[in-house]
Amino acid sequence: MPFKTRVTEMLGIEHPIVQGGMQNVGYAELASAVSNAGGLGLITALTQPSPEALAAEIERCRSMTSKPFGVNLTYLPTLNAPDYGAFAKVIINAGITIVETAGSPKVREIWEMMKPHGIKIVHKCTSVRHALSAEKHGCDIISIDGFECAGHPGEDDVGGLVLIPAAKDKVKIPLLASGGIGDARGFVAALALGAEGINMGTRFCATKEAPIHDNVKAKYVENDELGTNLIFRKFHNTARVGKNSVSDEVVEISAREGAVFEDVRHLVSGAQGAALLKSGDLDSGIFWAGMIQGLIHDIPTCQELIDRIIGEAEEIVKGRLSGMVA
């Protein structure tokens, strides 16, 4: 039984399941596999070295799926900012109809470029106040990120069980629940809390089509819900990453009195993280990981994963939950 929501209607997808944009993971292989399975796959724009490379990756994805897919474009905290406008123009010229964004309020500049072309904007937020601001400025769907998520959970430390319904109470546009979701139980819970779909990152990393080393996938299966570290807290740019010797060292150095970001910069470079995903050397850098690791027990195909979530969700709704109603 398909679950029909405003998200499936707006995005033209079969199931309200979105693969979040992930740096050095969101390539055509994964995006097309998710879309072919009835969800929404996303190519990560800034994983590509140039706007021209993004255009080629979009065409490569089109050769692998006839289903809708989108592009993620995140405003990163960096000293050497990429040419966001050039990447946005490639997205527009390629006829992409769905874009996931995240990052600073400056991201609205590319919304203004894209909205006249009918592009649907899905914006990732970690607080209700940010979600309300995004809605006010023309966003179409909010992806609300609970504290359990991989990547940047914000500085408020509010878990999805509270954050999702809190956002639903105030935001009128559709919500995707993100962070700590990886199976049918989380999917049904998200719908009950007021979301109209889910966004998964770490769970899609542990699939056969994810273009990362098997050692990394195995680590997601091996780890439990405690297998993450929160880094950069002192620098007000909190990030949740997989627990390993490098992230342990980042936490230890950051806890020292007077510590500054320069003290850990050599440990957390994006180049090292990208190399880790390719080499499988789990102590050569940091890698993104959410608390959902505790509920990841296998490495299925994207089709198997999505089919399982939808099938088991139907069983929960029609079976276990309905049986509780007197």
Regions found by a protein language model. Name each.
Residues 22, 180-181:
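Active-site metal-binding loops of divalent metal-dependent hydrolases
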Residues 154-176, 182-326:
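Conserved active-site-proximal phosphate/metal-binding subdomains
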Residues 1-170:
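Active-site entrance/lid segments in N-terminal catalytic domains of soluble metabolic enzymes
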